[in-house]
Every structure is written in structure tokens, then in C-alpha cells.
Regions:
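Short hydrophobic "helix-edge" motifs at membrane interfaces and signal-peptide entry regions
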Residues: 87-88, 290-292, 511-513
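Membrane-interface segments at or immediately adjacent to transmembrane helices
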Residues: 207-297
């Protein structure tokens, strides 16, 4: 496999009776030469694995070349990472059978992964996860998410790397030829056996790496023995401090949630009975009803209030109508579980009441890694079905994103309308279907149904990338020029959303039946703010977006709620509308009184203070323990409590 082809003897003499050169027997190599060749070849694979590891580690930093110089040896698990990459290198060499060609292929793969990781970090502030492989089947999404300039740069760079790698492999193969083509018999058979054995061993080791999070996994034990700290609360830092390979392995498949201590049917039933009694107590004073009211939940892509950032100054707020509305109805700040991305996870939290912060950190997209694995999944859709609503989900983009068709079906939605089924598909100058078209689709659904409708809308207008959409940007001061231009495009986009949302509410007021609306932004936009802003603004401020709860019927009393998790938005709607609730929402209300908002490693108490889990009050810890038990039962467990916790509450 790794040997060098013997050069044919080329004796120019033509004496009588001499055997022609091409028919002369090859001189066998000495065992020493074989050993030296093998050692050198193996050394090259180790060197390539080492270099590939350094390149991948550097791709987790904003300035990769600088990281290569100053950060290359910081990972405590560097050599364990090299070992994993080396196994992959050996696999490619054994499969290809030509050392230098195989190393060229490894170089190209390393470059591709590094570029993709760096680009994803720039655009979404998140590193590359194993679960991102699903996007390979959605090239249209990738092309729309990345600017044309980035695509051209990436394509040219990749082609250049592949050409250079192929040329290098070709040249080295000429200088150091491989196994002779004429090799036959036992020699060829032996070579093939060795290659097959290497392939099988490498596949076995890589399979172990793929099960990195299994109890007793030897790879995990080796990495843990180095003393590295898994930064599960911040995956970007996790990849930077522990290395790309460590971060990637850490995010391999895992059970979504660890079983809480004492989980059993008896324990779950006891909690369910407790909150059934609490719901009955709360419902005694609730006389409202949603039975004849349309309910619309609107996840507004990338919507935020940039004036909340102290570093930015605008001549006028981009969202004056929304700000005015927040002073008239129920509203507040939502603590988004992510920055620049995580739309599907915010959806998951709102519709299920289950917090991403309580799942294992390796669950990067709950829709794909949890919900889509089930035929049914407990959600608010069941509540609305029980109250006579027709549930409809609308998303003006590709239907395949984040396994939404399977997820919405599991939740219980009757229909999912993607961009292919929408009646209006205007773009309004932007890359994606605009919010006016999305709001019009909601109006169509309400008008087309006799019974009340529960409509869940996820918009696309303000999705990245930003740049070149609008001719009338709203640029702030306080940002570097290149960021200010992008922020100006974003500012104009949310200004249009602000206007279109106000028009949508005005249209709802004209309908004969009442409609309740929950509107929120899923996260701050990626790409437009420098990393330095996190230091000046603070992590919490970079994760807060506005939310509004509004009714076209009886106006809701103005209330500014404490900082809220997405899981609490529907409970706040039910509170504002004074409607009876099932036990699950009684549990969420109880949790809200103690911990209104939480994120990975962060809890905000009733006094709006950031506290660690260990510093929670006994009441808060008890509510969280109950919540985690039922959450596990819903998501991973036996669902002993589903029927009781979602039991239809009597209408007022």
C-alpha cells in the first residue's frame, strides 16, 4: 500500500545472450528499504493529520492565520484530536491506495470543512455541528443564506486548493511511485488484505468517535483525561478553547435529556396531580374564553429593537409603531436562546413550553434531533384543537428546513403552508418573501375558515444575508463603516416590518370575529454587529428581543412583563386573556413566578437578577425540579403525564 514502485532495470548493453532489460527479473528490495519506506509514509500521514488539525482549530477563530501563530497549541486535547484525524487520514490512504493522492484529498476536505466552519461562525455565530449535514440536501438554502461574493470567493478558493492538492499529489506520485502495477500473486493479495484490515480498523475507530457521548466511550475517556473543560454554554468558545475536533465530537448524537433522579410513573403522576389541582384553583377566577377567538403566533425573523443597544444611535427609531404598541398592551423583553440564529429552537420553546436550556447542550436543533423522531409530540396545538381551532402553520420559505413538515405533523397542525402554497409571494425589494405577503396569508386563512383558526407564522423578510436589498437604508452611528452599512439595510427591513405589522393589526380589527396575537423577534440579527459589541453591551442585552400580546377584541391592560423566556409567551397570552388553562400551563405559570427566563447556565429570578442554578431559592429549585421531570416525560420518557397535563380545561 505504502511502498514505492521499483524502477525497471535499464541496462543499455546489448551483448549476445543478454536478457533484454524489460524481461530481466526485478531486484528485490532489502527489508531495510521496505521498513524505511513504511516509516516515512506513516510519518507523512501523522504530519498531515497534525497540520489538518491545526487548520481546523484555526477556523474557529475570527482571524485564522493569526490563530495559527498564537493559538495552535492551546487545546489540552491537541494530540487526541490529531489521533482522530490520523485515523481518518489512514482510512483515505487505505481506500485510495496512493499515499500522495490520498493526502491531496485530505487537504481538500480539510480546507472545505475549515472554510465552511469559518463562514458559519461569521454568519450565524455558531460553529459547524454534525447535525449540519442535513443542509447538504438543501443547497438552495445555502445559496440564499450566503452572499454571491462569499460564494464566488469560496468556490474559487476551493477549486484552487483542490487543483494545488491534486497537482502536489501527482508530482509526489511521480517522484515517489507507489506499488508496481505488475505486482501479482501473494504480494498483491497480501497488500489487499492489509488495506482491507486498515479500512475496517479505521471504520471501527471512527464509529467509536461517532458515538463519543456514549457511556464508557474510550475516545471520550481519552479526551476527558486531558483535563479540558467542555464549554457547553457557549459552543463557539468550546471549539476555540478545546479545538475543532473536540467540539465536533462533543456535539455527536446524544440522548436529548438525561433522566432525572427518581423518574417513575408514580413520581410523574404525583407531579401531574399537583398541577391539576393548581390549574383548578387558578381557573376558578378565569372567565375568559378563546373558543371563538382566532389566535395568531408570529415569530418575526431577526426582529429586534436596535435602540436597546447603547452603542448605536439612530436619528429616529426604526420601529416606532411597535414601540408605541408596547406601551398600550401586554409586552416585554424576550430572552432568546441564541444570537444570530436558532429560529427553530425558539419555535420549539414557544409551541411546546420546553426549554432548550434543560436539554443536553449537544442538541443544537430540537426539531431535527428530537421532535422529528416522534410521530406525535406534546404541544400547544393540542390545546387549540381541544378548543375548536383549526391549526395552520405558515413559513414563506422551503418546506424542508429543519424537518418542519414532520415536526408540524407531530405537533398536530392540520396544514403547513410554505412558499410553494402561498397566495402572495412578493419580495418587496428583499431576498425573501416579505412580511406583507406573510401577513396577508394569515388573513386568507382566517377568512377561509368558518371555525376559529390557530395560525403559527414564521416570517423570512429580515433573514440574513444583509446588503443591497434597499435603496433607503437606516444607518446608525456607533459602528465601523462596513458594519453600519449592513445595519442600515437591516434597519430598513425591520422598519418595513413595523409598518406591515401595524397594517396587519388594523386589518384584523375589521374582521367580524376577535383575534389574539402574540408577536416576537426570535433573535438579534447576525452579521451586522462586531464581536466587540458583546463586551460593551453585555451578553444578556445581545439576546433580548421585543414581544407583544394584543387582542382585536377587548383591549388588554397595559402590562410590562419581566424578561421572559419563549416558553412563557403562550402562558402570558392565556393570563392576559383570562382563560382557563390545563395543568401543563399551570406548571409553567408556577415556574414563571420563580424563574421568568432561563438560558444555558443562566437563570433570571423574579427580581430580574441573573443567578446561577445553585443560588436559586428553594421554591425556584422545586418548581424547576417539577418542570424537568415533566419535560423529560414529554420529550424522552414514557409520557405518563401527557393526558393529564394537557387535559382540556373548562371554558369560561
Amino acid at each position: 500500500m505504502l511502498g514505492l514502485r521499483q524502477r525497471a532495470a535499464d541496462d543499455p548493453t546489448t551483448e549476445a545472450g543478454a536478457v533484454p532489460a524489460e524481461e530481466a527479473p526485478r531486484r528485490p528490495r532489502s527489508p531495510l528499504r521496505h521498513a524505511i519506506t513504511l516509516v516515512l509514509a506513516l510519518a507523512m500521514t501523522v504530519l498531515w493529520a497534525f497540520l489538518a488539525t491545526l487548520v481546523l482549530d484555526a477556523s474557529a477563530w475570527p482571524a485564522p492565520l493569526n490563530a495559527l501563530r498564537h493559538k495552535s497549541f492551546e487545546s489540552p486535547a491537541l494530540w487526541e484530536s490529531v489521533a482522530v484525524v490520523w485515523v481518518f487520514v489512514l482510512l483515505v490512504v487505505a481506500l485510495i491506495g496512493r499515499l500522495w493522492i490520498a493526502l491531496g484529498i485530505v487537504t481538500a476536505i480539510t480546507a472545505l470543512i475549515g472554510v465552511v466552519n469559518l463562514t458559519k461562525l461569521e454568519l450565524r455565530n455558531d460553529p459547524l455541528y454534525p447535525s449540519d449535514v442535513v443542509f447538504l440536501g438543501q443547497p438552495s438554502f445555502l445559496f440564499e443564506m450566503v452572499s454571491k461574493a462569499k460564494l464566488v470567493e469560496g468556490a474559487v478558493g476551493l477549486v484552487l486548493i483542490v487543483v494545488l492538492a491534486a497537482g502536489f499529489g501527482w508530482l509526489m506520485n511521480k517522484l515517489f511511485p507507489g506499488v508496481p502495477r505488475s505486482l501479482s500473486g501473494r504480494g498483491l493479495l497480501g497488500l489487499r488484505i492489509v488495506r482491507v484490515v486498515v479500512v475496517l480498523v479505521c471504520l471501527g475507530l471512527l464509529n467509536l468517535a461517532g458515538n463519543f457521548n456514549d457511556p464508557g466511550n474510550p475516545w471520550r475517556a481519552a479526551f476527558d483525561s486531558t483535563g479540558l473543560r467542555w464549554r457547553n454554554w457557549d459552543q463557539r468558545v468550546n471549539y476555540q478553547r478545546n479545538g475543532f475536533v473536540s467540539g465536533l465530537l462533543f456535539n455527536m448524537h446524544i440522548t436529548a435529556m438525561n433522566e432525572p433522579k427518581g423518574y417513575s410513573k408514580a413520581a410523574v403522576d404525583k407531579i401531574a396531580e399537583k398541577y391539576a389541582a393548581e390549574a383548578a384553583r387558578m381557573n376558578q377566577g378565569r372567565t375568559g374564553s378563546l373558543d371563538k377567538t382566532n389566535v395568531v403566533t408570529i415569530l418575526s425573523e431577526g426582529f429586534s429593537d436596535p435602540t436597546w443597544l447603547k452603542s448605536l444611535k439612530y436619528a429616529a427609531t426604526p420601529i416606532p409603531r411597535t414601540e408605541a404598541l408596547m406601551k398600550k398592551t401586554v409586552s416585554g423583553k424576550m430572552l432568546a436562546p441564541g444570537y444570530g440564529s436558532g429560529t427553530a429552537n425558539v419555535e420549539f420553546e414557544v409551541l411546546t413550553g420546553l426549554s432548550m436550556s434543560q436539554l443536553e447542550p449537544q442538541v443544537s436543533v430540537a426539531y431535527e434531533q428530537l421532535v422529528s423522531q416522534h410521530k406525535t409530540f406534546p404541544s400547544a396545538v393540542q390545546y387549540f384543537l381541544d378548543h375548536g381551532h383549526t391549526p395552520v402553520a405558515i413559513h414563506p420559505f422551503s418546506p424542508r428546513m429543519y424537518a418542519r413538515p414532520a415536526v408540524y405533523k407531530a405537533f398536530g397542525f392540520d396544514r403547513f403552508i410554505s412558499k410553494d402554497q402561498m397566495q402572495d409571494t412578493r419580495h418587496g425589494g428583499g431576498r425573501f418573501i416579505d412580511d406583507q405577503s406573510a401577513f396577508d396569508e394569515v388573513l386568507h386563512q382566517i377568512k377561509d375558515h368558518q371555525q376559529p383558526v390557530f395560525t403559527h407564522l414564521v416570517t423570512m423578510q429580515n433573514h440574513m444575508p444583509f446588503g443591497g436589498q434597499y435603496t433607503d437604508p437606516l444607518e446608525p452611528t456607533g459602528l465601523p463603516k462596513n458594519f453600519a452599512k449592513l445595519a442600515g439595510q437591516y434597519g430598513r427591513g425591520i422598519a418595513r416590518t413595523d409598518q406591515e405589522f401595524a397594517s396587519f393589526l388594523a386589518a384584523l380589527k375589521k374582521l367580524p370575529e376577535p383575534t389574539a396575537v402574540v408577536f416576537w423577534g426570535d433573535h438579534l440579527p447576525p452579521q451586522i454587529y462586531p464581536q466587540s459589541l458583546f463586551k460593551t453591551e453585555g451578553l444578556r442585552n445581545m439576546h433580548q428581543t421585543p414581544f407583544v400580546i394584543w387582542s382585536s377584541g377587548t383591549p388588554l391592560k397595559h402590562t410590562t412583563l419581566p424578561t421572559t423566556s419563549p416558553t412563557q409567551l403562550l402562558p402570558h397570552l392565556f393570563d392576559a386573556m383570562n382563560v382557563p388553562i390545563p395543568p401543563w400551563y399551570a406548571l409553567l405559570d408556577t415556574l414563571d413566578q420563580q424563574i421568568p427566563a432561563m438560558d444555558a447556565g443562566l437563570y433570571i429570578n423574579g427580581q430580574d437578577e441573573e443567578v446561577k442554578r445553585a443560588d436559586l431559592t428553594p421554591e425556584a429549585r422545586k418548581a424547576l425540579t417539577d418542570y424537568r421531570m415533566i419535560m423529560y416525560d414529554f420529550s424522552v420518557g414514557k409520557r405518563y403525564s401527557e393526558k393529564t397535563m394537557y387535559e382540556n380545561a373548562p371554558t369560561g
